[in-house]
């Protein structure tokens, strides 16, 4: 029971964390471009 619950939590959090990392990296990249310009 606990293993399935943990696996479900990990599978549910993985895409959210990946999306957060991508969004933060994209925002930082855009900010750097604006500062360079």
Curated annotation (Swiss-Prot):
This is Cytochrome b6-f complex subunit 5. It comes from the Eukaryota. One of its GO terms (biological process) is photosynthesis. It is found in: Plastid, Chloroplast thylakoid membrane. The keyword Transmembrane applies. GO terms for cellular component: chloroplast thylakoid membrane; cytochrome b6f complex. Component of the cytochrome b6-f complex, which mediates electron transfer between photosystem II (PSII) and photosystem I (PSI), cyclic electron flow around PSI, and state transitions. PetG is required for either the stability or assembly of the cytochrome b6-f complex. The chain crosses the membrane at residues 5-25. It is a single-pass membrane protein. The gene is petG. NCBIfam families: PRK00665.1. Belongs to the PetG family. The 4 large subunits of the cytochrome b6-f complex are cytochrome b6, subunit IV (17 kDa polypeptide, PetD), cytochrome f and the Rieske protein, while the 4 small subunits are PetG, PetL, PetM and PetN. The complex functions as a dimer.
